[in-house]
Amino acid sequence: MTLRGALAAVIAAAAAFLGSTAVATASTEPEDSTVRPLIVGGEDATQTYPFMVSLQRANGSHFCGGSLIREDWVVTAAHCVTGSAPSGVRARVGSVDRTSGGTLVGTSQIVIHPSYGQRLGYDIALVRLASPVGQEPIPIATSDGGPGTPTRLLGWGDACPAGQCGPPVTLQQLDTRIVPATSCWGINAATELCTDNPGGNAGACYGDSGGPQLRSTGSDWELVGATSRSGNNSPVCATGPSIYGNVTALAGWIDGHVG
């Protein structure tokens, strides 16, 4: 297999693992029962996260997470929105309940990183909201902090490793840390973060894609990553580290679009 073919295979397998619902049903509207955006081993959100976004189909079904980085821009995973038209995507911003609260708004533009699908490690996209929202955006960190840095993951969904439970309505959170890139399989260390699975049984899973990985400033949060895929190529969630798009490393491309 050529290098290009190998990279395409890795990217396709990764997208199928963590974002299978978003990618496979881009032209349809999945029922809630088929969506498995989860954090295994997490807990109900202990605070409000005004920047947290639930990306939804027109029928209100959640399919991916995202982070509000400007009053009218959201960063998410590219595999979440590839093949989707803005008219078929809406966003609920600033609620810990994926079914109510916050601000519900349509979207007007989807921008996929130009290297996504061509090179490993660019699973990042931007979604422009149809109108600005009043929630406070999250700043992008100037540095991811490197291995050992404590981080927090956010997401909705089934908390069972095999995806057999129903998705919770309440936002889940999990405290973890960045680990060396060598701990993850098929990772681009220049543009991605390898993130630990605490206790060997906690972490992100199917459809949790696009949701934020946060770094604490001591008094608030900064964005360092966006959920991408499994780091051990296993179909069972939380059995190994997870891979996150390194938003700090791609901040130049992001700023070029959102200003």
Predicted region positions:
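Chymotrypsin/trypsin-fold serine protease catalytic domain
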Residues: 97, 105-106, 110, 120-200, ...
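A conserved glycine-rich beta-strand in the N-terminal activation segment of trypsin-fold
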Residues: 50-71, 102
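Conserved H-D interstitial segment of serine endopeptidase catalytic domains
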Residues: 55-56, 74-77, 82-115, 178
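C-terminal region of N-terminal signal peptides and the immediate post-cleavage residues
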Residues: 2-8, 15-40
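Structural detector of coil-to-beta-strand junctions
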Residues: 50-52, 90, 137, 193, ...
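N-terminal activation segment of mature serine protease catalytic domains
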Residues: 31-57
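C-terminal subregion of chymotrypsin/trypsin-like serine protease catalytic domains
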Residues: 3-6, 22-28, 68-81, 90, ...
